[in-house]
Design a protein with these regions (language model features):
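Histidine-centered active-site microenvironments of extracellular/periplasmic hydrolases
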Residues: 7-62, 69, 90
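Well-ordered alpha-helical scaffold segments within catalytic/enzyme domains
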Residues: 1-9, 80-81
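Active-site rim elements
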Residues: 57-68, 80-85, 156-166
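Beta-strand elements within well-structured catalytic alpha/beta cores of enzymes
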Residues: 2, 19-24, 50-52, 73-78, ...
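Generic alpha-helical structural signal
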Residues: 3, 171-172
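Secondary-structure boundary motif
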Residues: 11, 100-103, 162
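C-terminal cap/loop subdomain of S1 sulfatases and analogous C-terminal strand-loop tails that border
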Residues: 26-32, 71-74, 79-150, 155, ...
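Short alpha-helix within the catalytic core of nucleotide-sugar-dependent glycosyltransferases
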Residues: 3, 35, 99
């Protein structure tokens, strides 16, 4: 149906004045890590689709790897519409990412927090920080930690938090 919407916009001369966004509020597990759900801070749940068609700013096929969050949506939509951003709104406008794709002036980390505890899904409370290379998860109900190197272990199967050579990584 997304294709039908895009075709309609094209056929009716509306493409140049319309920004189309396809996204979600989270990713979803399809058996990875033994889950068919969400709630954990693994990449399958943390990553969410964000596809945008904006002919005025973005060339077709453009791909960005910067860390964005759903708190960035409102500032982006406001700037795209030319509306002044209200005080106190969280997040950053992504418009600068489209104007300067290799910009170094973007966040290096994102924060995640799952606050429910052992509901019907059995997931303990946890929060964490994901950077470009590492992800640190804190299971604060039981003071447990997990650390993953997303460059060498993109499937997050090897917890490095107990290995002494990663002590400095945990501190920073």
């Amino acid at each position: 149906n997304v294709g039908r919407v895009l075709n309609y916009l094209d056929e009716n001369g509306l493409t140049e004045n319309t920004i189309v966004i396809y996204s979600s509020d989270q990713g979803f597990y399809l058996g990875e890590h033994g889950w068919y759900d969400k709630r954990w801070m693994y990449e399958e749940s943390l990553r969410m689709p964000f596809l945008i068609r904006w002919p005025e700013k973005i060339a077709p096929g453009t791909r960005h790897e910067q860390l964005i969050q759903n708190i960035d949506y409102a500032p982006t939509f406001l700037e795209a519409a030319g509306i002044e951003r209200p005080n106190g709104i969280q997040g950053k406008s992504m418009v600068s990412l489209y104007e300067k794709p290799n910009s170094q002036n973007w966040r290096k980390y994102v924060y995640y927090h799952y606050y429910e505890h052992l509901t019907e899904h059995g997931v303990p409370r946890h929060d964490g920080v994901r950077g470009e290379r590492y992800k640190l998860i804190n299971f604060y109900s039981n003071d447990g930690w997990s650390l993953y190197d997303l460059e060498t272990d993109p499937d997050e199967l090897k917890d490095l938090s107990k290995l002494p050579e990663y002590k400095d990584t945990l501190i920073h």
